[in-house]
Amino acid sequence: VVYNFGTFDFNTPNFLAEFVKGNLNYFLSVDYFQNFILQYQYEGRSIKEQVLNLTAAEKLKWQNALQKNLEGNNRYYLYNFITDNCTTRVKDGLYQFTSNQVPASDIKSFRVHVVEAPYQQGIPWIGLGIDLLLGAVSDEAPSPFQAGFLPDLLYDQIASVSSTNSFRLVV
């Protein structure tokens, strides 16, 4: 089973305008793993696997929370590029339902890491877009907790995490 916090409805009236204004609801969806893989392959998207060293109790807490999030309006959230997106939802769960500590971050600003992200390469206007969407926030240095707001940044952050019992989070 795959839980996906990055689901949205393209049929939302004024989709692009609502996204730019920060008024777009995203939602949690669930699918069979094989269906998820086939959809990503069809769309030409990549998937990176990261195996986590979680206890049975941590897995159960997280799974129960995900199931509760699927109920009714719990599944919807107002998308925010930095503080509440499909990546931050995973990050928040990881630190809420495990005994792991957030590692230090050397990120200098939100803008630098968005513009330099591998999936943004070759898009010359991305800096302007970040300025328009984020305003002055784009030049702020994120806290260690905020630093995992993009998939690649969270992937790297998780790879460096150890739990309070000294076990590595990533197997």
What spans do the regions from the language model cover?
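Acidic/histidine-rich, surface-exposed loop or edge segments in extracytoplasmic proteins
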Residues: 39-48, 67-75
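Activation targets extended, charge/polar-rich intrinsically disordered C-terminal tails
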Residues: 68-171
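Helix N-cap and loop-to-helix transition residues
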Residues: 32, 55, 109-111
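A structural motif
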Residues: 54-67
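Generic structural motif
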Residues: 6-10, 57, 137
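Glycine-rich phosphate-binding "P-loop"
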Residues: 51
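Glycine-rich catalytic cores of cysteine/serine-nucleophile enzymes that process amide/ester linkages
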Residues: 1-45
